[in-house]
């Protein structure tokens, strides 16, 4: 693009026009959530403290994701581009968790704004070890992180000091938890969000029983950001997990009172409801009928980018979807 070209930014969820930013001189092809260099970015919204939203920002989470894909060749480069963008133009959305990956690395980055009229965001990004798996499901997952490990951890310079300034944290740096400071846990975050992460960890590790009390509200000790699985996961393993309804666990919704004679794993919204003044809730599984689409990203360093990146894409509920492979350089 010629120098000085501007890019109009529209909010992903509503189509609302947010403003203009300077376009990069060169951008890369993007198919779904993967670009031509196999860089892949996914997200879940955790919301966090409502007073930190900034409606004057230009960059919303969806634009941040796709502009990051258009401009990056590695996961680390995507993190720098995304954080530079919100620092320059302001962050419009609520708290967000991003999975940012390339053929060699996977990072979890969490970000939240600083409040009305305050440009920028506080954020932290942690690299997932090669022998581990991680997950996030609409609740902030990063607690303590090693501020001295520059190779595996990146963060905004004020991520701790801003929390102190706002009164969210008053301990020593090593005890700082991004999640507790910026997205305090409530019942919904634990049972409807963290429970989905628990199901994933329960499926592929032997630690599920140790983490279940946290999901049930019996302890406040959180699950780790990442864990070592019992075996290396395949593409099929991840597809199957996206179809999960807590089958075979204490949270299996095909066995509760709402399952009916056919043991259906589906429930109508809302998750909470009242009968005769008594409040009840349905479990919120990974697979749900409210889904618009689902994907599994396969990134392969041992193959050329042209055929190395495959986006296994399906529409609607993952349990009903057919995963169709699309190469990252498809036109």
Residue ranges and their predicted role:
Residues 202-278, 284-286:
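Accessory, solvent-exposed terminal regions and/or long lumenal/extracellular loops of proteins
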Residues 91-95, 251, 304:
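Intrinsically disordered or highly flexible coil/loop and linker segments, enriched in small
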Residues 51-55, 63-72:
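Second-shell loop/turn segments in exported
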Residues 69-73, 83-91, 300:
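Hydrophobic/aromatic-lined pockets within catalytic cores
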Residues 262-331:
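Substrate-recognition/cap regions that form aromatic- and gly/pro-loop-enriched pockets
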Residues 1-60, 81-233:
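A contiguous strand-loop segment
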